């Protein structure tokens, strides 16, 4: 009976193993959404194409050589023996292991694209993505997961903080540094010293948030697919939930205190940072360890973004280096600090030789911590040296960076002939909402400075005046009713973007002050002749006034003449009639 139960259990976890692989594949969509949302609209199609191709190209390279380098017969602890068993011995081939390791390989390659987004040549991206999938990832992953020298020592990286996220993050840092920043990101003085950092807000934060939720969902497969018992799987799910949640709360509190408001995009990065940090120790730590890992991850991602912007002057549009490299390193080290025999996966790892002892904070001393430090340094050195060579060769041959014209116009149109990834949609168009719920300012309208306009009512001279008004979108319905009440029914309404900064109260995007922040506004144009201008101004102020900054502005112009296209009437007469 026990043999039957064991067989059933093995079959169930075999199915779960493949489901986990499918979840990891689904994470490709999450990476695509995060990178697209955190960058500008003119490069959206290019980013989607890169995320598609790094998986497809990676699959080809992994089939040809990557898989054998990773899981082939061990050669001196460094590399798997090259072979073509997938073609020559398909009947006995380990299909599940191939698919599982393939989707992990693709994750490493896709991390790099975010840090190098918006200015990398598409051909160059395809080349270095292929190299990562064929050589760089499979070899170092063999050291850890393929029976290589780190695995033999007892280095522990259960799901890839080191061999996937840190390697992808290091590749991203080196690539972004060699590539250079986006045009306008850093302002320099005559001596070449950076004197100002400019914020480039992502064009679609909701899309980025969707990507984060997709990634978090996929991470349950990323971390949990290799679990072999129900208890182990449950513990992994717990730590994979606690760490990112704590990281996000930590980041929210810190940015709220530091910048005056909780930073949305930074908190989204913090969720991913917590997931990266828990990836290596997820099976061997407990809830306390996951909490501590999450706290550090939440702070580390903010520090990482600041460090790259203000000290290293490396342009990373999506925070890939702070999320993956820094937290990949942290997660690797965290095994040596928080591994505990209380976790169900610890005994499994100890029996399999993939861990040598508990963490420093659980009485295990420095044994495991030393192994983790050795592994992180070794893998980091391998990735750094290889990627410097790869990027340098690409830069010297086919070129790494897109031209200035391509970058300014956008890679969608220049690289792919895609005029817009959002064809059929107009940027900035929003539904009008009623503004009755607006909070009125402390200062009454009557106490404010009265409006004085040097104009006259339409009389014998039939004076024509143009009134242009910029207002908050939510006040439009109130304004429209006010105009109807005084007899003004003709107007042209446009959705626009406007800016205005209150002195001493700047806004921040990812810790960078924003000099100009464009906000959705409604612009109304009216040409009037029979209604007194002061009536229009007074009614407008009454409708728009809240006492807060940003209530709007009224512009008054003299109009020389008006001609009605249909009848040819001009002046005052052109403004009369049902079609005006």
Description of each model-found segment:
Residues 414-421, 432-580:
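Positively charged, small/polar-rich N-terminal and surface patches that mediate targeting and assembly
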